[in-house]
Amino acid sequence: DTGKVKPFGQKDNGGDLVETAFLMQGLLAVHQYYINGNEKEKALAARIDQIWKDVDWNWYRNGDQNVLYWHWSPTYGWEMDFPIHGYNECMIMYILAAASPTHGVPAAVYHDGWAQNGAIVSPHKVEGIELHLRYQGTEAGPLFWAQYSFLGLDPVGLKDEYCPSYFHEMRNLTLVNRAYCIRNPKHYKGFGPDCWGLTASYSVDG
């Protein structure tokens, strides 16, 4: 491949911090696997470490705001104007941005941007199952919101002032998804206890 950007749209022809975070999460897992390997494996781990250190998370604050933005374009700048707030699949982006050894963001970016100073907290029930967080644009959210941030990050024991247990929250979000498919209020063909899992396939139309 050429290494050039393949834009999703006219103005989405530059950096994408969310997808970068997903990629980096996987690469860091590879780094940990190979770091003590043979010479080729150590060389691969070193290349990954350099990529990790090169990601400029701080740039995506769009002028030192206490929030991270999804897109930046070399031709359109910040015109897509998409600051990211929780909760959704993007938590890993804020965690990696805070953890960066070279371009780390201050804690206020997580608290003000992601958690919106506590507005992310909204205890409620969906399908009779307890959830603790407010999900963007929906009561619960699709299954990938429970998955993507934890492909390389273990949620067991993970908590903060906004959520007493990210493991239990994501488990319950998964159970909500399953319960909805079993109830199948819109009578979709095939939905049931053996056919469930609405991940990146949902839409505003149901």
Give residue spans per PLM region.
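Ser/Thr/Asn(+Pro)-rich, low-complexity disordered segments
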Residues: 1-206
